[in-house]
Amino acid sequence: VDTSEDTMGFDNIIALIKSQASPKAVAGMMKFGINTTNTYGVSIPALRAIAKKFRKRNHVIAQELWSSGIHEARLLASMIDDPNLVTEKQMEKWVNDFNSWDICDKCCSNLFDKTKYAYKKAIQWSTRNEEYVKRAGFVLSGGIGSS
């Protein structure tokens, strides 16, 4: 798989994720209560290495990655999306897509806490009933204070 930035389109990124699949890691993720539906078991350091190949953030590819529903693609989307282009609508869509604590926490700390809506969403979400939406509110609250 060619991994230069010029060829890091959606298909190549997904192929790269799949090439690093680790069934053993997936089994380990289950032990930590991570939802392993549509998961390949690629480590966070490996995903960060892919993200570093982008010299600047890429909102368009981030949207494609998120829409794939692949666990690691969603984590990567949170690493490469441009917080200046993230809308409240996108944040609401993504927070309602959260199906695991790690996606929630990483998306909030990689992306949402860098948006202009972070404070507003921290307040709104912390009063909601949905498990991962409420968690996102609390994760954002913690992130805002430390950034």
Where are these regions (language model features)?
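Alpha-helical scaffold domains
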Residues: 2-147
